[in-house]
Amino acid sequence: MDFTTTEAAQDLGGLVDTIVDAVCTPEHQRELDKLEQRFDRELWRKLIDAGILSSAAPESLGGDGFGVLEQVAVLVALGHQLAAVPYLESVVLAAGALARFGSPELQQGWGVSAVSGDRILTVALDGEMGEGPVQAAGTGHGYRLTGTRTQVGYGPVADAFLVPAETDSGAAVFLVAAGDPGVAVTALATTGLGSVGHLELNGAKVDAARRVGGTDVAVWLGTLSTLSRTAFQLGVLERGLQMTAEYARTREQFDRPIGSFQAVGQRLADGYIDVKGLRLTLTQAAWRVAEDSLASRECPQPADIDVATAGFWAAEAGHRVAHTIVHVHGGVGVDTDHPVHRYFLAAKQTEFALGGATGQLRRIGRELAETPA
């Protein structure tokens, strides 16, 4: 593999770091807590004005044509300050899927406006435990969708959703507008305190032109969702561990910094190894996905095992480092007046969203079992 990132990725990551560090102060985060939906429109506007949304978007949607490595760099930087913006959902996943699989009409009608920031798109991939997929019944000139999806990021503020569903001829992904009859979104309270919704489709009608594609689209969305969440998690853990190390250097007990105690130092060292392992596997996965995207549009992607490996590290390291952050900070770690508690919550949210470390290991096992020797 190639460990060297691109110059564009370095530049974009640095620019986003500068923007989010300036905007996402502890005071600003507390102001976001007062909103009905935690969507940082001020930061979103600054990212739009700086060209961040369009920089790594496909040229077919009016973007600059950079790719996965650059998007990963942006997501890591957004994670550093727990940025409450739908870059992952709207630009990377939804607009990316439309650019890769959608018709020219869908690209121009929805993808371009997502990349420009005029519309917010999201993806509805997850159902409640034990719940079947959304069902799409043909109606002659379109489909009627029935079912629910949960944990839809930025669902309460989204203009449209990409929804996988089962049809008579197999799986397909549809674009469903928030204003379509039969579409209802309920806001959810979640661990990460973000804008998350429950999507209910009660016979929502979509015409055939809103069909984005088949099984390959759903597979692509699942792979990119895991990769993107992993990138954001890296940013969260990096900054959270930095804050914890700084606290250990300055907090004194028994007339010496607590970081000088062996047990504390070992805990921080373990966290450092976890974060480095996550960065390594994320880099491998992003590079493989980027190579596959350039080589072919066919799915399933051979990068699946690499992405699941990175997802395992994001969940496992997320659990360990999140608890290290709280434990080393002591009482401060659970004081909501201190910003560090937000990193614990964000890390746990991503861990749960990925299905935990065990879920990713099972995914790797299935891929290995199904791969010919």
UniProtKB/Swiss-Prot annotation:
Cofactor, free-text remark: Binds 1 FAD per heterodimer.
CC cofactor: FAD
InterPro entries: Acyl-CoA_Oxase/DH_mid-dom_sf (IPR046373), AcylCo_DH-like_C (IPR036250), AcylCo_DH/oxidase_C (IPR009075), AcylCoA_DH/ox_N (IPR013786), AcylCoA_DH/ox_N_sf (IPR037069), AcylCoA_DH/oxidase_NM_dom_sf (IPR009100)
Superkingdom of origin: Bacteria
Regulation: Uncompetitively inhibited by high concentration of 3-OCS-CoA.
Residue sites binding FAD per the record: 251, 327, 331
EC id: 1.3.99.-
Catalytic activity: (25S)-3-oxocholest-4-en-26-oyl-CoA + A = 3-oxo-cholest-4,24-dien-26-oyl-CoA + AH2
Signal sequence range: none
A molecular function GO annotation: acyl-CoA dehydrogenase activity
Induction info: Induced by cholesterol and repressed by KstR.
GO biological process: cholesterol catabolic process
Keywords: Cholesterol metabolism, FAD, Flavoprotein, Lipid degradation, Lipid metabolism, Oxidoreductase, Steroid metabolism, Sterol metabolism, Virulence
Keyword Ligase part of the UniProt annotation: no
Oligomer and partners: Heterotetramer (dimer of heterodimers) composed of FadE26 and FadE27.
UniProt similarity note: Belongs to the acyl-CoA dehydrogenase family.
Function: Involved in the first cycle of side chain dehydrogenation in the beta-oxidation of cholesterol catabolism. It contributes partly to the virulence by increasing the efficiency of beta-oxidation. Catalyzes the dehydrogenation of acyl-CoA ester side chains of (25S)-3-oxo-cholest-4-en-26-oyl-CoA (3-OCS-CoA) to yield (24E)-3-oxo-cholest-4,24-dien-26-oyl-CoA. Also able to dehydrogenate steroyl-CoA such as 3-oxo-chol-4-en-24-oyl-CoA (3-OCO-CoA) as well as 3-oxo-4-pregnene-20-carboxyl-CoA (3-OPC-CoA). It dehydrogenates only (25S)-OCS-CoA diastereomer.
Protein name stated in the entry: Acyl-CoA dehydrogenase FadE27
Naturally occurring in which organism (per UniProt): Mycobacterium tuberculosis (strain ATCC 25618 / H37Rv)
